């Protein structure tokens, strides 16, 4: 009565790892109730776009978002197929939970959400409803009541079109490059938001973003989404450092945030120095491992190659950080 049937089912299953005793705690039911609320809030957001679709003959700026989530959904389906075959039901629920809460609600819906009182592209809206339906099918065995209700509220159904008897679509092949670009976009957004916060730039303060990268194609594929998420009026691709800006390093790429406001570089310098210290320590640990002849001779070739890639990435990042520090 306190949490509801779906939340209790969720709480029991999320705390039931295969082969182990049940480590149930009432907080698991609270997590299930919060998940219920998250689903309803996502439904409310999507229903707000109902009747506000607009057909567009132009390339849709949010097309990367739908493409990425389609591949992310299929990637999760392939993982879930293996988990169900091995009866790893609790692990499967955790995968579905993360897919819905993190990838769909926290990222995808934010990427496709139109501006205030703006219409959403009809193709994007239809894809979003389809994704929501697919997610409810995946979650249905664990939380049957809320998923069935949301499934029917997403759009009108014919008699007998019930999620409980509907066959789920099989997973299709995924594209690793699209998934990698999605992961890159998430990392860049998170990093640049943190940079804005540390430099006391308010969410409403606009910036211009300059990107120094060897892989412009990846950024061009999601340029519009990135600009919207960090409130950038323009995105420029440059081949050298831009002075008078806030700089940041993500992976091997450098970002320069240009603002009309007066900038304090002290916090920016402190962040870069901390990152530089960490990267140098990480590089030293990798070097130590690679200088051990017993490790190189006895470890699997792919393990040694992975360590060498780690070394190359760390060296590239150290170089990028040092170049950013030089511009301050």
Can you say where each PLM-predicted feature lies in the sequence?
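Alpha-helical recognition segments enriched in aromatics with Gly/Pro capping
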Residues: 1-20
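Feature 926 captures the class I aminoacyl-tRNA synthetase adenylation module centered on the KMSKS loop
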Residues: 2, 23-328
